[in-house]
UniProtKB/Swiss-Prot annotation:
Name listed for the protein in its UniProt record: Nuclear fusion protein KAR5
Entries under Pfam families matching the protein: Tht1
Residues bearing attached sugar chains per UniProt: N160, N213, N361, N371, N386, N407, N429
Stretches in topological domain Cytoplasmic: 491-500
Residues of the signal peptide: 1-22
Functional description taken from the UniProt entry: Required for nuclear membrane fusion during karyogamy.
InterPro entries: Nuclear_fusion_Kar5
Keyword Magnesium included in the entry's annotation: no
BP-aspect Gene Ontology terms: karyogamy involved in conjugation with cellular fusion; nuclear membrane fusion involved in karyogamy
GO CC aspect terms: endoplasmic reticulum membrane; nuclear membrane
Length: 523
């Protein structure tokens, strides 16, 4: 119905333009009659009524807010516009099906606050299912109805063009009428002036008969000039009018050609729109099938959502029970904690009160323990010292025996040394005698002094040999005696000093540990 009204309006526009083109060459009368024809046409009213009837649909009003975005691109739709359009489409669906909907969604309330209506729809699963389905389908619907809106835009453009052509023709008519009236006034004024001049000449002819010929000649000349000027002016005016008519005829012809081309384009667009309407019908059938499937899926989803809601309700109730139990446990723990805090405070006071007493007792016990330990250590030290002294006395006895043996050995060695010395002295004396005898036998001329000096040299030699022998004997004696002295004196003395050092170090460590323990207890 809407497409037929729109096409009929376009056909009326084309007929009007054709009438304008046909009357373009008829002059003033043709233009006036064409303008009267335009003024009496009711095609524009029919077109406007068709457009208003098409725009009064509820769904079209609901989609009016997103019409520019639908025409220029679906991606230009904002979330708020999508939400508002989905709400309006849901209300249109409720009204078309005769269903009741919340009071918050009535026009007087939802125009003030859209969110109130959406919150009211959310309370009912059926309303919310319709709203959510329309919210998701707004962009698809916008894409599907974009072509009819383009058709509506084209029709509005053609309507504006018709009004523009009407205003142009009215302007042409008014300008032509004004120009014709001005031209007639100019010619009338010129003829009035001419007639006044002729009257003056006729009156002066009776008065001045002598000057008639001269005046007539002058008048004739002036009249010829005036007539020629008037003819020139009239010719120029006629030429200007013809030029304006030709220019206007060319404009009208151009407008007629353009409107004819636009009519062809409109017919082509009408055919395309018819094909698209058929495709849209097919798409609507598919969409209805998909909507039925979607409705079934939404019902299943609603059932699952109800189950999930019931499960969540039970879970929330169990969580509330757990929270209450936890709250009771926390309160009980807080009471126990307060009791423990009081007990700890009391115990701290008792500790602060009895700490000096306990420290005193510990110090006394520690000192007693240290004294007892020191006495035990001293007794052990005395016992060890006695044992060491006994061992040392035994070692000394053994050493004395060894020294006796050594003394005997030394005595024997000294006797042996004395015998060796005596033997060496006797050997020396014998050797001297033998040397003196030998020298006297070899050299009878040697004096007594020479013999004495030789004997002294020999004695000095044997004395040196004797001393060397004594030194060697003493060294051998020391080498023999040193192991015995070492085993008898140095080893017991080192053992005794080592045991004494162990005992002294133990006593010092115990005293230091006791002092440190007392210091810690005092802190």
């Amino acid at each position: 119905m809407v497409g037929a009204s729109a096409i009929s309006g376009v056909v009326i526009i084309a007929n009007v333009v054709a009438a304008i083109a046909a009357a373009a060459g008829d002059g003033d009368g043709g233009i006036a009659s064409t303008t009267d024809t335009i003024l009496t046409l009711d095609g524009i009213k029919i077109l406007n009524n068709a457009l208003l009837q098409w725009k009064d649909d509820c769904n079209q009003r609901a989609l009016a807010e997103v019409m520019p975005q639908c025409i220029h691109g679906v991606e230009n739709i904002t979330p708020s516009q999508q939400k508002h359009t989905a709400m309006e489409l849901s209300i249109c669906e409720f009204e078309n099906n005769g269903l009741d909907y919340p009071l918050e969604c009535h026009a007087s309330v939802r125009n003030l606050n859209t969110n109130t209506c959406i919150q009211a729809l959310e309370k009912s699963p059926q309303y919310w299912t319709t709203f959510s389905g329309n919210y998701r389908a707004v962009k698809d619907i916008c894409h599907q109805i974009s072509l009819p809106y383009e058709k509506d835009q084209i029709i509005e453009v053609y309507e504006n063009m018709t009004l523009l052509y009407r205003s142009v023709m009215e302007d042409l008519k008014s300008s032509h009428h004004k120009y014709t009236v001005e031209l007639e006034m100019k010619i009338q004024n010129k003829f009035n002036k001419l007639f006044s001049v002729v009257d003056d000449l006729m009156r002066s002819r009776a008065e001045e008969n002598n000057k008639v010929n001269q005046t007539f000649n002058k008048f004739y000349e002036n009249f010829q000039v005036s007539i020629s000027n008037a003819l020139v002016v009239m010719q120029n005016s006629y030429d200007g009018a013809n030029t304006n008519f030709e220019l206007m005829q060319r404009h009208v012809s151009y407008f007629a050609t353009e409107l004819q081309r636009i009519l062809l384009l409109v017919q082509e667009q009408g055919e395309k729109l018819q094909v698209q309407q058929e495709q849209l019908v097919t798409g609507n059938v598919k969409l209805s099938i998909q909507q039925e499937r979607l409705f079934d899926n939404m019902q299943l989803f609603g059932n699952e959502l109800d189950k999930l809601h019931n499960a969540e309700v039970s879970r929330v109730s169990s969580v509330n029970k757990q929270l209450k139990l936890t709250e009771f446990s926390i309160r009980h723990a807080n009471s126990i904690l307060r009791e423990n805090t009081d007990e700890l405070h009391l115990q701290r006071m008792l500790i602060a009160e009895y700490t000096p007493i306990i420290l005193g007792n510990i110090t006394t016990l520690l000192m007693h323990f240290l004294n007892q330990s020191a006495s035990e250590i001293v007794e052990n030290f005395e016992h060890s010292l006695n044992l060491s002294l006994e061992k040392l006395s035994l070692k000394i006895d053994e050493t004395a025996n060894s020294l006796a043996v050594v003394n005997a050995t030394i005595a024997r060695c000294s006797i042996f040394a004395s015998s060796v010395v005596e033997t060496l002295d006797s050997l020396k004396n014998s050797t001297i005698r033998m040397m003196m005898l030998f020298m006297s036998m070899i050299t009878p001329s040697v004096t007594f002094d020479g013999l004495i000096s030789g004997a002294k040299a020999i004695i000095a030699f044997f004395t040196l040999v004797t001393r060397l022998a004594a030194v060697i004997a003493i060294c051998l004696l020391i080498i023999l005696i040193w192991p015995i002295v070492k085993s008898l004196f140095f080893q017991p003395l080192c053992y005794l000093m080592r045991r004494c050092s162990y005992i002294v170090v133990s006593i010092l460590v115990g005293v230091a540990a006791a002092n440190f323990s007392v210091w810690l207890l005092q802190k």
